[in-house]
């Protein structure tokens, strides 16, 4: 493992350095962190200016967490003083990227990018960006960590998430992917990105930036600029090559992959979770892994054993109840997919559905469409949560038991009315806080078992 000492940093940053720390004898750093919550002992803390303060305000917390030293554009006895901390961090990220000789895969899309990143990382034994960390500062820290810890040939898979125009170009300038994956184009983050054409334009930049391989999921293909079709590989369940057949009941994926010589490779596996979205992500991971030199059998074994990110269609068996936790995010396309997964689970089925945020002017109609979708579903009951979901509640008619709560606190007070057998989906935008409901139900079950 390499370390970053002050001399090395000065050599890399050049005239961006203003002064060395006043405190002498500081140890070399094992990496960088721009947020104290992500700081590991031995890393240097990069104190950035923010909308509500400066990172140096948290210097004591960083030191208590074990920071080797600080990098800041404001004076501190243990800080390497630079002209602009954000610019210095970006420079270090670009330097780290230049040291890599292995593939760097950028993964983006309106839905499915985190799961695809996770499975692709497993299939290729790659380092992956943690969680859904997508800011330039955080990704610069990921690049530096990979440079210091990994062999330069090890694959690196980075999630590229954006919610406004111009962000993708900034991320791509830093990450410079050799391979690009576009999972889906759908209505998400419309407030900052614009309409669906704007989403497609921004997301597809990852393909333009990737010289060695371009992979496009079935849900993105129709929205893609036709000029990119010839240079991109379309991947989806159904016909074509590559493609796959998915048995939802058995969680079995039977994949047909395209070999580099144009031939076919076949492999079957049991997926580590539920639903067609997971099967689609696995298919992409298997194809990219094959192109990166991993045998289909080994890639399939790794995908089958992958540990998925929490709160993405995560199933919990609570006695007679299967709780489907999809409380991390929500958009029209992911709501439909989650309801499809719920439909394959044991009856009686019910759902708790929160607001789909950041849809801009589409919010009213999108929630009305969700209500119509729920009305047609085979559900014993549905609980809507949040002000925007009121429209979905009003559009839900028929035989369902239906409820609306203005916020998660109100539902938590009434959670005794939720079903305790069959299957229950809980899904909504993260800001609604439905993860609190999931945790409350899990804790309730744990107490029941303990007693």
For each feature predicted by the language model, list its residue ranges:
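N-terminal leader/targeting and accessory segments in enzymes
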Residues: 1-91, 95, 343-347, 351, ...
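Acidic, Mg2+-coordinating active-site environments of NTP-dependent enzymes
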Residues: 9, 13, 72-76, 181-322, ...
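Short acidic-hydrophobic, aromatic-tinged amphipathic segments that line or gate anion-handling sites
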Residues: 80-84, 401-411
């Amino acid at each position: 493992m390499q370390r970053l000492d002050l001399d090395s940093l000065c050599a890399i940053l050049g005239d961006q350095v203003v002064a060395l720390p006043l405190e002498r004898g500081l140890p070399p750093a094992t990496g960088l962190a721009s947020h104290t919550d992500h700081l590991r002992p031995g890393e240097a803390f990069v104190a950035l200016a923010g909308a509500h303060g400066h990172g140096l305000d948290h210097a004591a917390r960083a030191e208590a967490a074990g920071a080797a030293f600080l990098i800041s554009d404001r004076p501190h006895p243990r800080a390497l003083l630079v002209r602009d901390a954000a610019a210095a961090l970006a420079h270090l990220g670009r330097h780290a990227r230049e040291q890599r000789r292995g593939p760097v895969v950028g993964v983006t899309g309106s839905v499915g990018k985190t799961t695809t990143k996770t499975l692709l990382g497993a299939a290729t034994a790659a380092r992956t960006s943690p969680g859904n960390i997508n800011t330039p500062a955080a990704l610069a820290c990921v690049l530096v960590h990979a440079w210091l810890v990994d062999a330069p040939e090890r694959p690196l898979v980075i999630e590229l998430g954006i919610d406004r125009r111009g962000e993708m170009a900034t991320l791509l300038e830093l990450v410079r992917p050799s391979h690009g994956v576009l999972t889906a184009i759908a209505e998400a983050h419309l407030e900052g990105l614009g309409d669906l054409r704007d989403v497609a334009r921004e997301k597809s930049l990852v393909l333009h930036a990737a010289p060695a391989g371009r992979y496009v999921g079935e849900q993105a293909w129709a929205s893609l600029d036709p000029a990119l079709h010839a240079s991109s590989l379309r991947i989806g369940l159904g016909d074509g090559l590559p493609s796959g057949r998915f048995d939802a009941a058995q969680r079995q994926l039977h994949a047909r992959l395209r070999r580099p010589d144009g031939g076919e490779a076949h492999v079957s596996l049991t997926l580590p979770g539920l639903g067609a979205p997971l099967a689609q992500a696995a298919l992409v991971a298997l194809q990219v892994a094959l192109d990166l030199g991993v045998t289909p059998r080994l890639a399939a074994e790794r995908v089958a054993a992958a540990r998925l990110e929490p709160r993405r269609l995560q199933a919990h068996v609570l006695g007679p109840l299967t709780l489907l936790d999809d409380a991390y995010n929500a958009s029209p396309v992911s709501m439909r997919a989650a309801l499809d997964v719920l439909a394959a689970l044991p009856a009686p089925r019910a759902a708790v559905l929160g607001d789909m945020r950041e849809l801009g002017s589409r919010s009213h109609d999108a929630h009305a469409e969700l209500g119509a979708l729920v009305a047609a579903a085979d559900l014993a009951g549905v609980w809507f949560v949040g002000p925007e979901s009121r429209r979905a509640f009003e559009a839900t008619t028929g035989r369902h038991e239906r409820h609306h709560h203005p916020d998660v606190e109100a539902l938590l007070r009434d959670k005794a009315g939720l079903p305790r057998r069959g299957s229950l989906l809980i899904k909504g935008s993260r800001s609604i806080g439905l993860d609190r409901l999931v945790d409350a139900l899990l804790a309730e079950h744990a107490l029941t078992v303990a007693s």
